[in-house]
Amino acid sequence: MAGHSKWANIKRQKARVDAQKGKIFARLSRAIIIAARHGGGDPAGNFQLRSAIEKAKAAGIPSENIERAIAKGTGTLDSDAPLEAIRYEGYGPGGVAFLIEALTDNRNRTAADLRAAFNKQGGNLGETGCVGWMFEQWGIVTVTAPRDEEAFLEALLAADVETYEILEEVAEVRCPVPALETVSETLKEHGYTVLDTESRWIPMNTVEITDEDTARRVLKLMDALENLDDIQSVATNVTMSDALMEAMYV
């Protein structure tokens, strides 16, 4: 009986992992479609597409799936309803601002899903522009953490950027979005391994949450939004102490 129970738990866990993997594949495939549509199907001349393909390969998406997504983006392969990129904005618990980027073939469905997620946690989906002014969009280049910070600074100066943050095993370099390709290539030329490139919405000011109930609802809303099929990214202006964050996952 114990053995059967263990096997049932393993099956449930595998189903969750498979479902999550499917969502990641769909999200990355959509990013490839949009990149190919906007900049053409040649990765050599389309940095956004090249970056999307690299992320897809890193996630284990088969090459034929990648080629199919490119073909859909360029119009050489018939596809379903066209995808469009839409930005949604709203307020979560505690007045936390949410900026959400979606790729959808049905904006009414996506808006309804978002509205339900916000309402469940006591937030509300707002009008375009209600929180967008609180964020700035930056390019982020993630590299392996440098052993010599002085040499790293020299590489950053060569790339004409100054803002960076060294985390545990990586460093994040901030630059204007149009400079992502140049900064990435310059860092590679200086011997740094580029792990990721992306555009990211960064809050100009933050809202600190100090009580557990509000923090829990904010995190639940973030999880709910990120798990929606159409959502590509979720940015917020929330901040909370490490102790409070740890308490949420006990």
Swiss-Prot record:
Disulfide bonds: none
Annotated localization: Cytoplasm
Primary location: cytoplasm
Pfam families named in the record: TACO1_YebC_N, Transcrip_reg
GO biological process, one term: regulation of DNA-templated transcription
GO molecular function (one): DNA binding
SUPFAM superfamilies documented for this protein: YebC-like
Entry annotated with the keyword Amino-acid biosynthesis: no
InterPro entries, per database record: Integrase-like_N (IPR017856), TACO1_YebC-like_2nd/3rd_dom (IPR048300), TACO1_YebC_N (IPR049083), Transcrip_reg_TACO1-like (IPR002876), Transcrip_reg_TACO1-like_dom3 (IPR026564), YebC-like (IPR029072)
GO CC annotation, single: cytosol
Keywords carried by this UniProt record: Cytoplasm, DNA-binding, Transcription, Transcription regulation
PANTHER family for the chain: TRANSCRIPTIONAL REGULATORY PROTEIN YEBC-RELATED, TRANSLATIONAL ACTIVATOR OF CYTOCHROME C OXIDASE 1
Family: Belongs to the TACO1 family.
Cited NCBIfam families: PRK00110.1 (NF001030), PRK12378.1 (NF009044), YebC/PmpR family DNA-binding transcriptional regulator (TIGR01033)
Protein name as catalogued: Probable transcriptional regulatory protein tll0175
Species this chain originates from: Thermosynechococcus vestitus (strain NIES-2133 / IAM M-273 / BP-1)
